């Protein structure tokens, strides 16, 4: 691609589209510092160093509490009450209270375990102060407000409905009714137990998801996004409808390492959509092609969306098993997108981009070989050595930062600017640490709120009652049950992010599908059911 277009790609990718773009001065420095500390905490937690040095080891629940605490604090430091307003002093106070509610679990974890779910009440003279009831209730309310700011109202409404169902269960329709949880039991289960807010979903976020998001952030800041786009244009840019196919291919390659539809769209769409419009695609079709290809990045191995990691923990299989089963559907989906874009180009009579305006394939491929090394490291550790996803992504992330450092040192020999290159590497690394944490705010908050729903289902016996309800509606008709699941996914998907949508529907419907399928003479593998819900 010629120099001006090449520069345009880099400018679009470098454009600050993050939630922190309105922050300035001391406020920005504080947010950046907290984000970097969060990233270092996650790197330490995922590394083998705590076991090697017998220092800094964190148990499951305290680690999850710290993880959510960082997410809540950053959410209130970055996202104001109303989108167009600014963060004020009250927002900062709420953020500090939120992380304090989480850190209470870290500092008093042993006491919580010893009391076996009984909430502590402080005796002060003739007064009894339910300290932990206040802390837990405050934490839940702050989590819901953070979700409203970061994700939106729909997920909050659903979570509140499940909380009300937990408390007022005796007033629900008879077929799903239950005795109702006391406020102490409700708060204790939701905030201080490992089956709800701090359950499996956020545990997966702590163990795997953060580092995969961090890996994608490092790769993007090092120039990986531009490399994959250039490579996509070099491969298919000259074909009929080339920009659309390049958008699909670029989004697919970016999706292999980002696992985020939003990050994918931002990285590739800011450049590919204008190019598609210039070559003849309508703005609606250009946007649709980019969104479809970017969203499909969540199902593209080796780094799928956050829901895939939650799925592995729900089912009790390795992440590699999920990747293995998801690979073929992902390839088929991108082949279908290629075919559709080709038909659109034929219908519109479009041609490809002129060859002299495209990057040369060999030069482009060789220029970014160092970006492929960490990806191969990740695949090798996951697939061949069968290391845990946590260790695999940790070593892949370290290899990415190290390879980028070596690349900067080697290239400095050509331009004799070692100091400048090392400064660039340092800046890319720091920005990667910041972006990784900031990109995780929405994921962490959404997963924690989805945990409210999981906790409500588990504590009220709703899943068992729901099987009876669904069976009475479907009457052992698997097709009707599948259609009900599809409709539920679509309705929730209009307002929920992918991971939250998956957690909610999987909690409600996955075992129902398996049980009704068995009763009807069909054997549905549990992994197939969960992938169906995910897709």
What is the predicted function of each stretch?
Residues 129-134, 195-208, 235-247, 279-285, ...:
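Membrane-interfacial loop-to-helix junctions in multi-pass transporters
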Residues 144-179, 200-201, 222, 226, ...:
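Flexible hinge motifs at transmembrane-helix junctions and intramembrane kinks/re-entrant loops
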Residues 145, 150, 160-175, 183-187, ...:
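Core transmembrane alpha-helical segments of multi-pass membrane transporters/permeases
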Residues 2-28, 35-36, 324-439:
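Long, contiguous bundles of hydrophobic transmembrane helices that form the permeation core
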Residues 1-127, 133-137:
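Conserved, well-structured core domains of diverse proteins
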Residues 20, 77-87, 137-153, 313-321, ...:
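Membrane-water interface regions at transmembrane-helix termini and the short interhelical loops
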Residues 229-297, 307, 316, 499-535:
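Hydrophobic transmembrane alpha-helices that form the pore/transport pathway of multi-pass ion
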């Amino acid at each position: 691609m010629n120099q001006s277009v090449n520069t345009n790609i880099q400018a679009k990718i470098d454009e600050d589209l993050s939630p922190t773009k309105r922050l300035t001065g001391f406020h920005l420095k504080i947010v950046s510092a907290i984000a970097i500390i969060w990233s270092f905490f996650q790197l330490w937690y995922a590394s083998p160093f705590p076991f090697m040095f017998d220092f800094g080891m964190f148990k499951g629940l305290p680690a999850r509490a710290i993880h959510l605490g960082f997410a809540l604090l950053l959410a209130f430091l970055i996202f104001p009450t109303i989108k167009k307003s600014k963060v004020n002093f009250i927002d900062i106070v709420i953020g500090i209270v939120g992380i304090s509610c989480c850190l209470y679990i870290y500092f008093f974890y042993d006491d919580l375990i010893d009391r076996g779910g009984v909430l502590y009440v402080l005796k002060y003279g003739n007064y009894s102060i339910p300290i932990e009831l206040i802390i837990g209730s405050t934490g839940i309310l702050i989590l819901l407000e953070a979700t409203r700011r970061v994700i939106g109202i729909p997920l909050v409404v659903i979570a509140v409905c499940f909380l009300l169902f937990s408390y007022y269960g005796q007033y629900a329709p008879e077929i799903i009714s239950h005795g109702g949880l006391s406020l102490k039991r409700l708060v204790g289960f939701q905030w201080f137990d490992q089956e709800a807010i701090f359950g499996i979903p956020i545990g997966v976020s702590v163990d795997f998801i953060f580092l995969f998001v961090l890996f994608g952030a490092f790769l993007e800041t090092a120039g990986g996004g531009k490399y994959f786009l250039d490579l996509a244009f070099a491969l298919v840019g000259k074909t009929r409808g080339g920009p659309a196919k390049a958008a699909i291919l670029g989004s697919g390659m970016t999706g292999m390492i980002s696992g985020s539809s939003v990050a994918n769209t931002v990285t590739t769409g800011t450049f590919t959509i204008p190019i598609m419009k210039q070559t003849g695609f309508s703005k609606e079709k250009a946007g649709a092609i980019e969104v479809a290809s970017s969203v499909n990045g969540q199902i593209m191995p080796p780094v799928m969306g956050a829901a895939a990691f939650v799925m592995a923990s729900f089912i009790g299989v390795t992440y590699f098993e999920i990747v293995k089963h998801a690979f073929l559907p992902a390839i088929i989906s991108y082949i279908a997108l290629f075919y559709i874009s080709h038909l659109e180009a034929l219908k519109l009579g479009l041609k490809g981009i002129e060859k002299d305006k495209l990057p040369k394939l060999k030069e482009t491929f060789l220029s970014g070989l160092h970006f492929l090394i960490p990806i191969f490291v990740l695949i090798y550790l996951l697939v061949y050595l069968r290391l845990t996803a946590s260790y695999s992504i940790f070593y892949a992330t370290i290899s990415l930062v190290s390879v980028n450092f070596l690349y900067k040192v080697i290239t400095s020999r050509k331009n004799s600017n070692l100091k400048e290159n090392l400064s660039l590497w340092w800046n890319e690394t720091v920005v990667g640490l910041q972006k990784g944490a900031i990109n995780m705010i929405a994921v962490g908050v959404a997963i924690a709120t989805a945990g409210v729903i999981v906790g409500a289902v588990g504590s009220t016996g709703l899943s068992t009652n729901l099987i009876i309800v669904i069976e009475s509606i479907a009457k052992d008709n698997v097709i009707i049950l599948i259609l009900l699941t599809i409709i539920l996914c679509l309705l929730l998907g209009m307002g929920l992010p992918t991971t939250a949508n998956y957690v909610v529907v999987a909690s409600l419907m996955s075992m129902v599908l398996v049980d009704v399928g068995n009763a009807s003479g069909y054997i549905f593998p549990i992994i197939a059911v969960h992938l169906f819900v995910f897709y």
